[in-house]
């Protein structure tokens, strides 16, 4: 009986959190940035450590953006599974892909923040977009994000996430 109460309590709690998120987080509009020569440069920054199984798909989706002024930077954070080799091969044939080899992490830094910091230092865009290596972008992700950032006074946007399972 106690397990039933715990289960019902958990469902009520998670339903409340979901409801609050639906209210607070607005989806990006389906509008695209109007054509102009003044589109800000966007840097898509991808920290990657041992992501050989997903990195090519991530990079490929990032490069297929319907936006004229962007670069993709991928930092190989000392991977041991072949991620660096895949990135070296891709950056050799793709112009706006920048492959960065991560530096040794200082003692007072954590791994992912250090990788993101290195990416931010190398990026040349006015807008920095950070994604994980297991993320695939829709072709209109960058235009929608730029449009949303220009329409509202915001310093960050959160995209719609499509998950394969409940536990993701």
Which role fits each region the language model picked out?
Residues 59-105:
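Acidic donor-binding segment of Leloir-type glycosyltransferases
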Residues 116, 128:
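Short aromatic/hydrophobic "clamp" motif used to bind/position activated sugar donors
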